[in-house]
């Protein structure tokens, strides 16, 4: 929580929110996190669900990368459904690079 400014994140995300149909799945995932960080879990759930749908249809994503992304994004969706926001554990970046997440 000390590493982020959720109000500013939501301000910046407004442009993206207005263009939700034009966004790709990573952008939708980011908007969902900004919404959740500001307590708007219902809309965070909507954006994360749309992100998962678009990610599943991404033909440029390999099967392995799709499975890993689905796992991470579904976990975030579960948090939003339980009124919890998502904070990246920066140690997870090394795990993702190593293919363990």
Predicted regions and their residues:
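Terminal, low-structured helical/coil segments at or just beyond the last alpha-helical repeat
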Residues: 3-7, 15, 21, 25, ...
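Short helix-adjacent coil turns
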Residues: 4, 39-40
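"A position-specific structural signal for the A-helix of alpha-solenoid helical repeats
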Residues: 30, 34-37, 73-76
């Amino acid at each position: 929580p000390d590493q982020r400014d959720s109000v500013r994140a939501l301000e910046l995300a407004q442009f993206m929110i207005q263009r939700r149909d034009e966004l790709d799945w990573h952008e939708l995932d980011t908007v969902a996190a900004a919404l959740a960080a500001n307590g708007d879990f219902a809309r965070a759930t909507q954006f994360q669900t749309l992100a998962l749908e678009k990610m599943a249809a991404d033909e440029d994503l390999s099967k392995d990368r799709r499975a890993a992304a689905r796992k991470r994004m579904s976990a975030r969706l579960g948090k939003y459904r339980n009124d919890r926001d998502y904070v990246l554990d920066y140690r997870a970046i090394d795990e993702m690079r190593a293919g363990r997440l």
